[in-house]
Amino acid sequence: MTEESHPLRGAGNFFGRRHGKPLRSHQKNLFEDLLPRLKINVENPAPQDLRTLFEAKVDAVRLEIGFGGGEHLHHETGRYPQTGFIGVEPFINGMAKMLAALDGEPRSNLRLYDEDATAVLDWLPDASLSGIDLFYPDPWHKRRHWKRRFVSDANLDRFARVLKPGAKFRFASDIEHYVNWTLQHCRRHPAFDWQAEGPSDWNHAYEGWPGTRYEAKAFREGRRAAYLTFIRR
């Protein structure tokens, strides 16, 4: 995809602060030693066959945007060793947790990126992904910040370009307004169908879902999550 054909990246980043608590020395070492070996270089052209990105022999490739502490992504990479995963997380402390998990249990079917996910989406070849996961993204509560929500017409266009026909876009959130926002955007987009027949389809977590620390905190505070699945036409 050429630079001229990229959808607009919008006004500002889709994520908030990049850094929280100071990193410990071991975490800093992982950023210096492990991340460079796993990080995708979007300055180079993407391979037409994305499966060649991975050390492991894989049959399909999925993308997780904003993986937080990496609980779900690390779980999925172990659960599906023949699927390649690209994980994007710009928050430094979240990436540090993921790198620590990989230091203990390496994954040969995983690549990482620690900056804006739209750069990866614009880098990917057409119809190259078997799935995109976006779980508990920043809801940007204030109305003036809604334009920074990751679910947008421009990003759904990006999803539509890189997803194979029949591939899934999965979205989970505990913020009702963002859930409704996502439903409205996806249902009016010509490339996506909502896969739901009744409340049980969005009130129950995905099969094999490991849960996340953020989700557990939301439940403790009395919020409920919705789990949406959309199919690329």
Swiss-Prot record:
S-adenosyl-L-methionine binds at E64, E89, D116, D138. GO terms for cellular component: tRNA methyltransferase complex. HAMAP family: tRNA_methyltr_TrmB. The gene is trmB. Pathway: tRNA modification; N(7)-methylguanine-tRNA biosynthesis. The lineage of its organism: Bacteria, Pseudomonadati, Pseudomonadota, Alphaproteobacteria, Hyphomicrobiales. Belongs to the class I-like SAM-binding methyltransferase superfamily. TrmB family. The active site is at D138. It comes from the Bacteria. This is tRNA (guanine-N(7)-)-methyltransferase. Substrate binds at K142, D174, T212, R213, Y214, E215. Keywords: Methyltransferase, S-adenosyl-L-methionine, Transferase, tRNA processing. It comes from Brucella anthropi (strain ATCC 49188 / DSM 6882 / CCUG 24695 / JCM 21032 / LMG 3331 / NBRC 15819 / NCTC 12168 / Alc 37). Its EC number is 2.1.1.33. Catalyzes the formation of N(7)-methylguanine at position 46 (m7G46) in tRNA. Residues 1-21 are annotated as: Disordered. It catalyses: guanosine(46) in tRNA + S-adenosyl-L-methionine = N(7)-methylguanosine(46) in tRNA + S-adenosyl-L-homocysteine. GO terms for molecular function: tRNA (guanine(46)-N7)-methyltransferase activity. Pfam families: Methyltransf_4.
